[in-house]
Curated annotation (Swiss-Prot):
The lineage of its organism: Bacteria, Bacillati, Cyanobacteriota, Cyanophyceae, Synechococcales. Its EC number is 1.1.5.4. One of its GO terms (molecular function) is L-malate dehydrogenase (quinone) activity. PANTHER family: L-2-HYDROXYGLUTARATE DEHYDROGENASE, MITOCHONDRIAL. Keywords: FAD, Flavoprotein, Oxidoreductase, Tricarboxylic acid cycle. Belongs to the MQO family. This is Probable malate:quinone oxidoreductase.
Length: 497
């Protein structure tokens, strides 16, 4: 993809977005729809957009709606199911669906290029896990968001849903599964490019590839000055607002900003690998995303899943992820990334997390040294008939988990977190899952806290509501609103229950 040249001799912008992945793409899309007069620049170190964390093989492509991800509904100390996170994620994902429906109906993006509907299944074995899944099903179906969820402990029924997970399995095994037909597989790489292709038609939007951020600092007149490298030269740019959405590298850029809010953060890099199958006789038999339950005490990234994926018009099966450790913060990053992030204000927190999470470090090490045979043995827990010759190993993307300094020392946080400068002039996105699936909700919050929208916030709410078609459904109670929102999204996006 080509870059637009800088058109303003003074190199002044209303907003500069660092990184051309799904997060920056979503924010840029919202900005151009809500505030089309803004002069926006997106800079990307690589030659093409969406090729790091958003890359098709660098993530699972799951439209995270908490349909099947059991780690989103943990048990509390009293054995009660905690559902708040699942509800929040589901509602956030519906906002993403609403935006896509809005853009597709106005012919601004083509959803057929990046979105496929596919059932989301939770599958467990053993009495304890079956009991948990029953409890989860009963609790979740009390809510409108999950009323269409199905439960079965019938071996034959589960076989009809996902035959590969029961083939060669003992039919006397205690098993259970839930299914939500309205699941999705999403190619976030293609979605990112759809966004950028559309917004690049706006004369106020510029996108520059092979462009790297070297430094950024606040000037005396409260603007940001960014020093970048492009086309073999260094250029200084000025802007009122900066968004740092560069995946794992964001932590390094955030530290360069020297905002007080950045001083409590560090990053813990986690790599990943997939087992991939292209064998047609297998890919045609599996049409679902099947998530299992992680072992007690295991980190969230250890949740195993067997996914149907469509990438560049071809169907694949992916199993994993198998975690690992590297000092890189990006797949195409530097082995110095972790060391460059160590500062005097986060070093003790980083060391504290290392001491407290010795089990995690051991887990990552054990995952890193697994043989192909051992990885296939893991796969057989989900797919007993797996043949090693049908599967090959491929690197997934890098994730940098958040380390945050607290009164009790360093804390390792899984998930996504927004860091905002007090004056709203800079925002940074840290962390990982559910990330891309909830990008619309996350970027709406970024927009609300930014300095870009100086009018009454209620006007911003109205603009967002209009963009997401939610204004058409106002004055309805919560359940009716959600039901009609889903019906409208289903109709436009092509899901037929």
């Amino acid at each position: 993809m080509t870059s637009k040249k800088f058109s303003d001799k003074k190199n002044n912008y209303d907003a500069i977005l660092v990184g051309a992945g799904i997060m920056s793409g979503t924010l840029a899309l919202l900005l151009t729809e809500i505030l089309p007069e803004l002069k926006i620049l997106i800079i990307e170190k690589l030659k093409i957009p969406g090729s790091e964390s958003s890359g098709a093989f660098n993530n699972a492509g799951t439209g995270h709606a908490a349909n099947c991800e059991l780690n989103y509904t943990p048990l509390d100390d009293y054995g009660h199911l905690k559902i708040e996170k699942a509800l929040s994620i589901n509602r956030s994902f519906e906002k993403s669906m609403s935006l896509w429906a809005s853009l597709y109906s106005s012919q601004k993006i083509d959803i057929k290029k990046f979105l496929k509907f596919i059932p989301h299944i939770s599958f467990v074995t053993g009495s304890e896990n079956v009991s948990f899944l029953k409890k989860r099903f009963k609790k979740m179906t009390e809510y409108k968001e999950f009323e269409d969820m199905e439960f079965s402990s019938s071996f034959n029924q589960i076989s009809s849903w996902a035959p590969l997970i029961t083939k060669s399995r003992n039919p006397l095994d205690e098993v259970a599964a839930t299914r939500v037909k309205r699941g999705t597989d999403i190619n976030f790489e293609v979605l990112t490019r759809e966004y950028l292709k559309y917004i690049s038609k706006n004369k106020n939007v510029e996108i520059s590839y092979e462009t790297e951020l070297n430094d950024l600092k606040k000037t005396s007149n409260k603007e940001w000055e960014l020093n970048i490298s492009m086309e073999g030269r260094k250029v200084n740019l000025k802007t009122s607002y900066v968004f740092l959405g560069a995946g794992g590298k964001t932590i390094n850029y955030l530290q360069k900003s020297n905002i007080p809010e950045a001083k409590v953060y560090g990053g813990f890099p986690v790599s990943g690998k997939w087992l991939i199958c292209e064998e047609n006789s297998l890919t045609e038999k599996h049409n679902a995303k099947v998530y299992g339950r992680a072992d007690i005490g295991s980190p969230p990234m250890s949740v195993p899943h067997l996914d149907t994926r469509w990438i560049e018009g071809k169907k694949f099966l992916l199993y994993g992820p198998f975690a690992g450790f590297t000092t890189k913060f990006l797949k195409q990053g530097s082995y110095l990334d972790l060391f460059n992030s160590l500062k005097k204000n986060n070093l003790l927190s980083m060391l504290d997390v290392g001491i407290k999470n010795n089990d995690l470090i051991n887990y990552l090490f054990s995952q890193s040294i697994k043989s192909h045979k051992s990885r296939v043995e893991n796969l057989r827990n989900m797919m007993p008939s797996a043949d090693p010759s049908n599967w090959y190993l491929e690197n997934a993307g890098q994730r940098v988990q958040i380390i945050k300094k607290t009164k009790k020392g360093g804390s390792l946080k899984f998930g996504t977190e927004i860091v905002n400068a007090a004056d709203g002039s800079l925002s940074a996105l840290l962390g990982a899952s559910p990330g891309a699936s909830t990008a619309v909700s996350i970027m709406i919050e970024v927009l609300k806290k930014s300095c870009l929208f100086t009018l009454d916030k209620s006007i911003l709410e109205q603009k967002i509501s209009h963009l997401l078609y939610e204004s058409e459904l106002k004055n309805q109670n919560e359940n009716d609103f959600l039901e009609n929102l889903k019906k409208r999204n289903n109709s436009i996006l092509g899901f037929h229950p």
